From Swiss-Prot:
Binding residue positions for ATP: 122-129
Family to which this protein belongs: Belongs to the ClpX chaperone family.
Domain of life the protein comes from: Bacteria
PROSITE patterns with a match to the protein in the record: CLPX_ZB
GO molecular function: ATP binding; ATP hydrolysis activity; ATP-dependent protein folding chaperone; protein dimerization activity; unfolded protein binding; zinc ion binding
Name recorded for this polypeptide: ATP-dependent Clp protease ATP-binding subunit ClpX
GO BP: cell division; proteolysis involved in protein catabolic process
One Pfam family this sequence matches: ClpB_D2-small
Domain ClpX-type ZB: 1-54
Protein residues bound to Zn(2+): 13, 16, 35, 38
GO annotations of cellular component type: HslUV protease complex
Length: 428
């Protein structure tokens, strides 16, 4: 088919027609041949198609109201934070859609700057969940990094470039896709310097990390080691542009409320002073009055604060909010545990006062919504241990006494349930 001459020694590519002398390599198949040039061309076509399919469809960019409604189905409360994030994320990806500039050449192009987000508030109130839910809705790569593990370059610990590696890995090493992703840096309050005054000694895990993060937050082409770890002079690097990467920076910022109160004069002394308890929900509402100077006093450097123009906060969760978290969201804990018991053909029910007791325990422990799962595990441990081995139990009922007094939940046998069923049919 592709043989030339009687000797059959001269072959040519079945696709482009070039002879084996005109190309570097000719690969044989069953009755066909393909050259290295055609293979390279096929690879380019496949890569282009994959990159086009992996890109975010900007025509379908959700509006702020749609983003808010999606967040509302997963996150209970925190209306101000959800509204702020919805607007900030929409504006960010609208900027990416516009290519970072607006206007025509005659009037001069207007560059749209990036607006990273600072999300502060007590632990267990939904900061991480908000960021995760945003990434899920937009279908963009998402990575979570812990600021406490980061150190300045040259010291023991993780380099800031490892944050970008996590994003690249989340995008299956598709760098172009990773360049429009979201990075959530948690525990950023732990890299605050010890005082607002510059330190004489080198602060490699505090101020040094803040300085190392500056260029990445602002937008730069960073060199990332493909296997992580420290940089070596002879290894290859992945180049990633962080200009269109949205950074959401979160932290509990314990003690920041006192700095804000002292500035706005809310703190009072004397016999008639209004005292707020440690777990008073009003304590976190003061974050709504935050100013950059408060973060400066806390230990964040001015350059770092300046790269986080959007500041929003989450508030402490009260009993009503915690009960809603247990029952309302799509992935509510009560629904999750009911599903676990359904897999063993057992119904699980919680009385209303049991849910109130679980919420009260979470408030007492000061762990917020994150502590609800630990309490549920403690309450259901004995039942989850016995139920898989028993076939006579049809229903488990958890009451307030089970939560507070650690008694065993009520087990309803299958024969009782089956006897009740015909009676209900007769009455109906």
């Amino acid at each position: 088919m592709a043989r030339i001459g009687d000797g059959g020694d001269l072959l040519k590519c079945s696709f482009c027609g070039k002879s084996q002398k005109q190309v570097k390599k000719l690969i044989a198949g069953p009755g066909v041949y393909i050259c290295d040039e055609c293979i390279d061309l096929c690879n380019e076509i496949i890569e282009e198609e994959l990159s086009e399919s992996s890109e975010l469809k900007w025509d379908e960019l959700p509006k702020p109201r749609e983003i808010y409604e999606f967040l509302d189905s997963y996150v209970v409360g925190q209306e101000t934070a959800k509204k702020t994030l919805s607007v900030a994320v929409y504006n960010h990806y609208k900027r990416v859609q516009a290519g970072g500039s607006s206007g025509d050449g005659s009037k001069g192009e207007v560059e749209l700057a990036k607006s990273n987000i600072l999300l502060l508030g007590p632990t267990g109130c939904g900061k991480t969940l908000l960021a995760q839910t945003l990434a899920r809705m937009l279908n963009v790569p998402f990575a979570i990094a812990d600021a406490t593990a980061l150190t300045e370059a040259g010291y023991v610990g993780e380099d800031v470039e490892n944050i970008l590696l996590k994003l690249i890995q989340a995008a299956d090493y598709d760098v172009k896709k990773a360049e429009t992703g979201i990075i959530y840096i948690d525990e950023v309050d732990k890299i605050a310097r010890k005082s607002e005054n510059p330190s004489i000694t080198r602060d490699v895990s505090g101020e040094g990390v803040q300085q190392a993060l500056l260029k990445i937050l602002e937008g730069t082409t960073a060199s990332v080691p493909p296997q992580g770890g420290r940089k070596h002079p002879h290894q290859e690097f992945i180049q990633i542009d962080t200009t269109n990467v949205l950074f959401i920076v979160g932290g509990a910022f314990a003690g920041l409320d006192r700095i804000i109160e002292s500035r706005i004069g809310k703190k009072s002394l004397g016999f008639r002073a209004v005292l707020h308890g440690k777990d008073d929900p009003d304590g976190s509402d003061v974050f709504g009055d935050i100013m950059p100077e408060d973060l400066l006093k806390y230990g964040m450097i001015p350059e770092f604060i300046g790269r986080l123009p959007v500041i929003t906060s989450v508030s402490n969760l009260d009993r009503e909010a915690l009960i809603r978290i247990l029952t309302e969201p799509k992935n509510a804990l009560v629904r999750q545990y009911k599903r676990l018991f359904e897999l063993d053909s057992v119904d699980l029910d919680f009385t209303s006062d049991a849910l109130e007791a679980i919420a009260d325990q979470a408030i007492l422990r000061g762990t917020g919504a994150r502590g609800l799962r630990a309490i549920m595990e403690e309450v259901l441990l004995s039942v989850m241990y016995d139920i898989p081995s028993r076939k006579d139990v049809a229903r488990v009922v958890v009451t307030r006494e089970v939560v507070l007094e650690h008694v065993n939940p009520t087990l309803v046998p299958r024969d009782v349930v089956s006897k009740r069923a015909p009676r209900q049919e007769k009455s109906a």
